[in-house]
């Protein structure tokens, strides 16, 4: 954590840095395999020097304190031995001033000549990389991963799909928002051309043609503490349009005795999160809820996975609130499969179609 970061804690310096060796994640994967989990995709954050959300786009080599390239490769190889898939977090918008190649000439510039930025995330001071430059860095960095024996199944290009298109007024690389979406799309398309599954933070309609899956697509209340009142009745509008086009993983937390996110995963026919280990506390839905053992979470995920396997390529054709307060909801897929969730009683019913 850089001292200028909004998350830096000068009063508790021991909280500012955390290293989880690749070997620890490898052992965790072995434990998951021993529980009989057949399909796993591991999304790995903070795998490179000098840590999560730092010095992008110059994000290599693999973190030495975590085991370096050798430790990372061992983790990847173990994943593949079990038939699992491995992907990384990466970033080509947040442009950190500490990056060795940082050059403000490649940062997004406003018409008045100023360069917007902030110091909120772990890497401290940053601008925004003009997306005209992003494809170059993607190809450069992924070539380095390949050279070191890291066989990627997927890659997550952070924030590309949860932020609006950027504009740049630098006369050397003028960019409209439409241009920005095109360059971001080019990055995803290049990943796909290399056999790497593409993903980003959430899904915007412009990005659907480029993405295989996303990080998540939570309702807004899921990004706030569980005691925060909902602003309305959450319904899966996005899935009613795009369910058969992109995979959406859903949080599976039982956040309180009255709220279980598993029900939303079922209602939307999404994929489940088995383990989530968020970097920033109380941010992006990373709140402490009721503790669920890995064994119980595995069984919960089995139910959601079974439904997702049967409906992933099907349209979500109907959703309805069966009670006036929305506490009981039903969704139906194009083959007749239906899900009824009672959020008051915390129960569900699944009926499989043809």
Predicted regions and their residues:
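Active-site-proximal substrate-binding groove within the catalytic cores of carbohydrate-active enzymes
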Residues: 10-14, 18, 99, 107-153, ...
